[in-house]
Amino acid sequence: MVELNLDAGNVISGDVHRVGILALGSHLENHGPALPIDTDAKIASYVALEASLRTGAKFLGVIYGATEFPYVKHGIHIERDELLEGDLKPVLRKARKRLNIDAAVIVNGHGGNQLEDCVEDLMDELDMEIIWNNRIVEIEGPHAGSGEVSAGIILGIADLTRLGECRPELYPEIGMIGLREAREANKGIDRAARICEKEGINPDPVLGQRILDDAIESVISDVRELLEMLP
């Protein structure tokens, strides 16, 4: 068998090849008129790939499916167990087998909002270390709001000519302002909607870059943490 040069290139450690980074974000979710329906997948993929490039960890791509709480009705999602059994587990098993991955960071860009509590069981079943990175969700703010549009500017996926159409009466998913069931079921969603109602959408490339950089650095930190955990 060929001996691989694991320390070659700009990598933080030869062992970093044992760590994978997997993106998880919805491809089929309305984000108002200024952002595409696969915004979550693109943001999560960008963050995951950039962290991979800066550390040398393996980029494992993006999961095709996404799950969401049943009261959030702004896109097409699948059941949590279907995503877990049909998408997430097979990808991680194949990465473990084909790439000798012993650990992974899952970058959640709103594609796995019901999966975080499954991580411990997932680690036991797959016999690998996993960190669930939720930084994008934590910092980008209301759905299809200023934060996401600002990040979209940096990625080149935002259409600023349509900002004038960003009205919740036309696109109820903006800030989830018009998603009454979701607002009634989840105080956090209602709080974010109230912020968006009050402040509107104010795109800012500086904010967008800051959000992306923060998320990338968070994933890099997780990669370093996993390296310390590996035998």
From Swiss-Prot:
| Family to which this protein belongs | Belongs to the creatininase superfamily. FAPy deformylase family.
Q: Which domain of life is it from?
A: Archaea
Q: In which pathway does it act?
A: Cofactor biosynthesis; coenzyme F420 biosynthesis; Cofactor biosynthesis; riboflavin biosynthesis
Enzyme class, spelled out: hydrolase
Q: Which NCBIfam families match?
A: ArfB_arch_rifla
A Gene Ontology biological process noted in the UniProt record is:
riboflavin biosynthetic process
Q: Which reaction does it catalyse?
A: 2-amino-5-formylamino-6-(5-phospho-D-ribosylamino)pyrimidin-4(3H)-one + H2O = 2,5-diamino-6-(1-D-ribosylamino)pyrimidin-4(3H)-one 5'-phosphate + formate + H(+)
- One of the record's GO molecular function terms: 2-amino-5-formylamino-6-(5-phosphoribosylamino)pyrimidin-4(3H)-one formate-lyase activity
Q: Does the keyword Iron apply?
A: yes
Q: How does it assemble?
A: Homodimer.
Role according to the record: Catalyzes the hydrolysis of the formamide of 2-amino-5-formylamino-6-ribosylamino-4(3H)-pyrimidinone 5'-monophosphate (FAPy) to form 2,5-diamino-6-ribosylamino-4(3H)-pyrimidinone 5'-phosphate (APy).
Q: Gene3D superfamilies annotated for this entry?
A: Creatininase
**What protein name does the entry list?**
2-amino-5-formylamino-6-ribosylaminopyrimidin-4(3H)-one 5'-monophosphate deformylase
Instruction: Give the E.C. number(s).
Output: 3.5.1.102
Query: What is the organism of origin for this protein?
Result: Methanothermobacter marburgensis (strain ATCC BAA-927 / DSM 2133 / JCM 14651 / NBRC 100331 / OCM 82 / Marburg) (Methanobacterium thermoautotrophicum)
Does the keyword section mention Transferase? Answer: no
Q: How is the cofactor bound?
A: Requires one Fe(2+) ion for activity. Requires an additional second metal ion that could be Fe(2+) or Zn(2+).
